[in-house]
């Protein structure tokens, strides 16, 4: 089933028993987090808080709290058993878009042309009088405190906007970038835009600051987009394809867009049926900035982007299960807020796995597999355990062909997608080991690994800024474990032969099993 907007998706989830309305008053400060966390850990439904304490906007939480709801959001109507396989089909689509196979026949050429036509046909279209601009706040009416922005954890620095799709464009690009970056509320119309240096929004901003120093940088933030667009923003879409086009492919209908209303931001387009849109700028720093608080990291001084307004962000509880350190990020000044009538505020929380980002990671893991297999045909399976904070550990299953092959795969994974830049640990196993079963993975590590021979350590590599275990923020080491059977040249000893029961005996016991009454 395809969904034209968030409300359509909510209605469908409610009919399926996948969404529960909460009519009792619940505070966005801590209480929603506790409720959502308990429900998510139990595999429960999405929650729509109809009466958030002190606010008039309903709050939607846990929307993608199960892999099945992620698949439904991508337009795949599958039962729980078929969900992961359906997500791999989406990965195959992305793989074909990223690197099409050369056609081997007229039939293959026809398929390639059909795919190209489908992508072309799904180019977004601009509409007039969009629902997302039914209500407009301008001037003194712009007040972010009117929105039920969650404060998720007791030690958080303040309310945090979490599910905003940030729309940016670089100075030399026609394609808009969609990214999800958390944003700390620091004033009536001020948010801190926490985008890490390698993310698309930060790259667009730096390029703009270099080409147009001292000019305000336009930004739009979308709250409550349709599920295909929201999930497109967290999917590794090829650079040649916009997230809006990919959302159209998932939805089976072109994404309808609206031009922003604010002069200077009207170069950006947002989903026409979004619930709430924030329009504004990152402004150049006016005058000398205030000195950094005692004990805080120094203000950024290098690069053209350093000349823009920055503020100290955090600390916040994060997907690691810890509060992160404070750091400087640009300030986003909101000039205008547009919304639908009876708008819904979409939110989430992050914390020790499992949380909603971890569930998204489990689902997107299946999208990654065909992409990896396209580049590395020897990879037979791939798993990012949610306990590893979504991406910090990867287990790779491969068909090994020569000595040293596992190490080649490690370095290939680390360098393939931006999403794997921050993967600290990679364990490589053979085809006989189920990468989703910790018992089998631990067995392979403890029986097939010599720590000195089979451990790869790489120093001074990019690492997640939130990883406080690294000695320097943003720079740390990586470790690979070769837990495959060793080939000649990798060991001088006779390798162990796995124990396996005789097939005829197993068949005999299968027949006896029921007779004995053990089943």
From Swiss-Prot:
Catalytic reaction(s) noted: a 4-hydroxy-3-(all-trans-polyprenyl)benzoate + H(+) = a 2-(all-trans-polyprenyl)phenol + CO2
Residues at which prenylated FMN binds: 180-182, 194-196, 199-200
Recorded metabolic or biological pathway in which this protein acts: Cofactor biosynthesis; ubiquinone biosynthesis
Cofactor note: Binds 1 prenylated FMN per subunit.
InterPro entries assigned: UbiD (IPR002830), UbiD-like_C (IPR049381), UbiD-like_N (IPR049383), UbiD_bacteria (IPR023677), UbiD_Rift_dom (IPR048304)
Annotated catalytic residues: 318 (proton donor)
Binding site for Mn(2+): 177, 243
Enzyme nomenclature, EC number: 4.1.1.98
Name of one Pfam family that matches: UbiD_N
Location(s) in or outside the cell: Cell membrane
Keyword set includes Manganese: yes
Protein family: Belongs to the UbiD family.
Entry function: Catalyzes the decarboxylation of 3-octaprenyl-4-hydroxy benzoate to 2-octaprenylphenol, an intermediate step in ubiquinone biosynthesis.
PANTHER family attached to this UniProt entry: 3-OCTAPRENYL-4-HYDROXYBENZOATE CARBOXY-LYASE-RELATED, FERULIC ACID DECARBOXYLASE 1
HAMAP family: UbiD
Name this protein carries in UniProt: 3-octaprenyl-4-hydroxybenzoate carboxy-lyase
Origin species: Burkholderia thailandensis (strain ATCC 700388 / DSM 13276 / CCUG 48851 / CIP 106301 / E264)
Primary gene name: ubiD
